[in-house]
């Protein structure tokens, strides 16, 4: 290992920049997140080509254990340049990496069977959550087994505190765990049947609370029907008991209104339509054998049973469009089917690689110097995970670039025509993946507990039977290698490297404008803007890569300097017109998710992006439509409703806002966003006070056109901190230039008597 060649960051970045054809963000993300490194920060790969050879060689090693193995060269050709098949982050980082003892799984769910509301059970889950996060996994678990607030307990407390304090405990644990420079990811869920579900729903509305977790409510059909019809609904604990300890009737409509309001206000909670999830779940055909689904992974695309895990992989849909953005555009279904079959095979190989990694983790635990009492809990955790992984062999084959595929085919995202085409693609994917799993069952054996009889009435299996009777007959005869196969994940950083839209989502913005500082004396410099201190800036256009391809295909000059009006006109001519994240037809997007969901055996991670000025009635309408359309879950994000999230810069005019509230079909083109890189001398400012690890802090949020532009933070009420009257909530941040040319930022506010006070040097 000491003989391996190492590279500096600059060497790897330069090679990767060339690999990604000048895409700085893609190059930087790859070097920072996915290049093979050791714990000292040494980099052992120069570009993604090195990584793909590493992955191909390891997967080919597993292939040799079985009949008809794929070669390393064939596997590399599928991975190269992120063109066809892209493993998710954990497999990309971990496969063949001997420098880290970490899992290849992207996500886990944990839970305790039986009585799990004791302090011991709650603490056990806390420990297991941390142990998994330190191995790079995201974690989900359900809180429905914790007894509600005020119920008797047999300890000195006399009554239960309810589940909200434990939400905060699990959230804080997440924030403590570092995963290669990022904190852990956590999903907390609770059943709407639980008497504390309202407190759960409100928990994140208090600033600074439960900041380390996503939260989702598991909603059953009975509740949805009661909410729509304004009928009472019964909550109880235990939630599935015929003889509950606690039982109460509530107004379903009122509680539903709170869910809608909170989602509108803060983008949480998400909703999980639990009856749909369980009804459609193939693993739940084996619920009595330990495969009862209890929660989801942090992004919601994989519902899981306790101690099961999943590895993810995406197929780049754009790469199967021949002659993209032309009248001759055609989707190559035959090549797509071949590659999906190989993707499913690669995913099964990655399970074997994960089982090897688990053995290494368990060996490390055994050899750690701690006493056996301390090590036992972690060791037993990985024993349970290994057992579930080998019994079910669950996979997560998904897609990315749906939005670009639709545009390349000359369709508009959010139309019925585009939805119908997408459903055809996902039906093809599902049948090809399941056919591959059946073929592997012939060669490698079915998953350990396969039973055709148990699955006979599962809706997803019945759709396969109707669509491909021969596949169904073969599955009855040979079984299936994997208990479940499919998902659609967000693919955030993955899509940066494929240089496409992410997951099932439309493009965020096809084109936007930026400014960069230039020397006006340099040759070929075009000065578009000079700030108040005399610095010169040049404006330049940033194109979404596939929008740029549309321009090239249609003979549009990509080097020309376009005006704002010309860019708007170009967007209006393109298939990305009215098809960005914020201006698609939102109801059609939800219906599209529901239609595709019928061909995805796990779930789909989708966010419906809404403008800031939509009302709660629209959120309600979208959630109800998601339930009726067969979605397994739904997440709403209203622009500006959550701090720390990228938001749109421009405001929409009043006429368009009125149309959006009615979910209008015919909306004007969204104007080009101008990303301002030169701040004005003064910015309006909001003052936010918060706690960080029990310390009091203050944040100054500079606003440009009413939206966050910059933020300064510091300790308050401390000798070296920032002292402000508690009544101060607004002011100005002023950029100052000192005589020596140094810049500083001052905060200025008015006191109750109208006098201005300035705090220098934020």
Residue spans for each PLM region:
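Acidic/polar, glycine-rich intrinsically disordered N-terminal extensions of enzymes
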Residues: 1-104, 256-265, 624, 628, ...
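Gly/Pro-rich turn-and-neighbor structural signature
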Residues: 60-113, 120, 234-262, 266-271, ...
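Conserved catalytic alpha/beta cores of large enzymes that bind or transform nucleotide phosphates
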Residues: 160-164, 174-262, 269, 323, ...
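Short, Gly/Pro- and small/polar-rich lid/capping loops
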Residues: 471-477, 648-703
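Catalytic alpha/beta core of large soluble enzyme barrels
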Residues: 24, 300-302, 354, 461, ...
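Function-dense linear segments that define catalytic or interfacial modules
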Residues: 36, 58-65, 78-155, 163-166, ...
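Internal maturation/activation junctions in enzymes
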Residues: 75-76, 236-239, 339-386, 390, ...
């Amino acid at each position: 290992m000491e003989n391996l060649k190492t590279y500096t960051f600059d060497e790897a970045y330069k090679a990767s920049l060339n690999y990604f054809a000048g895409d700085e963000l893609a190059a930087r993300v790859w070097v920072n997140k996915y290049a093979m490194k050791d714990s000292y920060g040494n980099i052992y790969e120069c570009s993604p080509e090195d990584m793909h050879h590493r992955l191909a060689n390891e997967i080919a090693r597993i292939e040799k254990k079985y009949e008809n193995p794929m070669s390393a060269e064939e596997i590399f050709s599928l991975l190269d340049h992120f063109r066809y098949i892209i493993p998710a982050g954990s497999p990309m980082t971990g496969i063949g990496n001997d420098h880290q003892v970490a899992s290849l799984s992207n996500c886990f769910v944990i839970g305790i069977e039986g009585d799990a509301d004791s302090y011991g059970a709650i603490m056990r889950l806390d420990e297991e959550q941390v142990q998994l996060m330190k191995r790079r996994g995201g974690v989900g678990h359900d809180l429905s087994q914790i007894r509600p607030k005020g119920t008797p307990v047999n300890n000195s407390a006399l009554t239960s505190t309810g589940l909200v304090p434990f939400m905060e405990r699990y959230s804080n644990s997440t924030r403590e765990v570092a995963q290669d420079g990022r904190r852990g990811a956590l999903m907390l869920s609770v059943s709407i049947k639980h008497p504390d579900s309202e407190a759960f729903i409100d928990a994140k509305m208090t600033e600074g609370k439960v900041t380390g977790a996503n939260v989702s409510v598991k909603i059953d059909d009975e509740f949805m029907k009661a909410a729509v019809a304004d009928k009472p609904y019964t909550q109880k604990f235990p939630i599935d008991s015929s003889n509950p300890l606690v039982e109460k009737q509530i107004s379903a409509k009122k509680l539903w209104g709170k869910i809608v309001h909170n989602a509108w206000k803060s983008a949480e909670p998400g909703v999980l339509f639990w009856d749909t999830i369980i009804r459609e779940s193939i693993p739940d055909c084996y619920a009595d054998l330990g495969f009862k689904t209890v929660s989801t992974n942090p992004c919601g695309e994989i519902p899981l049973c306790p101690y099961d895990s999943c590895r993810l992989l995406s197929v780049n849909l754009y790469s199967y469009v021949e002659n993209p953005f032309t009248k001759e555009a055609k989707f190559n279904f035959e090549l797509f089917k071949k590659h999906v079959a190989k993707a499913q095979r690669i995913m099964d190989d990655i399970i074997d690689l994960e089982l090897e990694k688990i053995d290494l983790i368990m060996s490390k635990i055994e050899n750690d110097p701690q006493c056996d009492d301390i090590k036992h809990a972690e060791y037993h955790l990985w024993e349970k995970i290994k057992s579930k992984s080998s019994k079910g062999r669950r996979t997560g084959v998904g897609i990315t670039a749906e939005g670009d595929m639709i545009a390349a085919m000359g369709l508009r995202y959010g139309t019925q025509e585009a939805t119908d085409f997408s459903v055809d693609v996902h039906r093809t994917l599902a049948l090809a993946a399941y056919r591959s799993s059946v073929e592997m069952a012939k060669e490698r054996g079915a998953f350990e507990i396969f039973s055709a009889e148990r699955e006979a009435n599962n809706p997803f299996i019945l759709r396969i039977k109707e669509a491909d009777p021969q596949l169904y007959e073969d599955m009855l005869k040979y079984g299936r290698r994997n208990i479940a196969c499919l998902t659609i994940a967000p693919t955030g950083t993955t899509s940066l490297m494929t240089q496409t839209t992410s997951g099932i989502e439309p493009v965020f913005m096809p084109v936007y404008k930026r400014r960069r500082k230039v020397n006006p004396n340099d040759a070929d410099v075009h000065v578009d803007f000079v700030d108040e201190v005399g610095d010169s800036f040049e404006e330049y256009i940033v194109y979404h890569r596939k929008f740029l391809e549309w321009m090239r295909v249609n003979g549009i000059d990509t080097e020309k300097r376009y005006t704002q009006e010309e860019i708007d006109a170009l967007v209006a001519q393109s298939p990305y017109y009215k098809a960005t994240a914020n201006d698609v037809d939102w109801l059609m997007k939800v219906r599209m998710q529901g239609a595709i969901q019928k061909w995805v055996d796990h779930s789909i991670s989708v966010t419906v992006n809404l403008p800031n000025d939509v009302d709660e009635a629209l959120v309600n309408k979208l959630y109800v439509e998601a339930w009726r359309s067969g979605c397994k879950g739904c997440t709403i994000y209203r622009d500006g409703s959550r701090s720390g999230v990228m938001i749109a810069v421009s405001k929409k005019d009043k006429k368009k806002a009125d149309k959006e509230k009615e979910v209008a079909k015919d909306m004007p083109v969204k104007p080009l966003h101008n990303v301002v890189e030169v701040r004005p001398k003064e910015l309006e400012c909001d003052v936010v006070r918060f706690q960080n690890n029990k310390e009091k802090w203050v944040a100054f949020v500079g606003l440009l056109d009413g939206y966050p532009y910059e933020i300064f933070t510091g300790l308050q009420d401390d000798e070296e901190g920032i002292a402000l009257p508690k009544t101060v909530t607004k002011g100005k941040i002023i950029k100052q230039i000192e005589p020596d040319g140094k810049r500083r930022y001052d905060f200025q506010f008015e006191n109750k008597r109208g006098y201005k006070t300035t705090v220098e040097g934020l």
